[in-house]
Amino acid sequence: MHGWTEIRLSMRELLALALERACYVREPGGQVHGLIYRPFMAWIGAQFGFTCQLIENTPVHASAPAVRPGQALIASVSWEIRDPATHAPRRGGHLVLIHAAHAGTMRFHNPSGYSHNAASATLSLGVFARFHAGRGILVSARA
């Protein structure tokens, strides 16, 4: 999403703003987890001017074609997606950013990926679907 906005904030600043807007759950020990979609969508719409569409109960083969230039899909997947050979992966609990989907191929940023594939991993739609939880957020840049 680099280049979508002129606003530049550090990760620390982004996290503080997201916590102020109840976008995450903060545990008593201070750990942060669990992106809460609706407050997050409202925040990035107001703060950055992005348009968001909630995706729920939708298989990735139906939601991925919506990703076009100027859009990205924040998709809920299992963290095990970094190892596509995982036999029986769980679904959900981790987020990736799909930045391209065409011809049955998904290209995505995976923050928990290995160094060789974290920035831009590629999987077939069928393999990606095994890890996908059927939910996410379609984010569009300002028109």
What residue spans do the PLM features occupy?
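Noncatalytic regulatory segments and standalone regulatory/sensor domains
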Residues: 23, 27-28, 33, 68, ...
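Short coil/loop residues immediately preceding or within conserved phosphate-binding loops
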Residues: 93
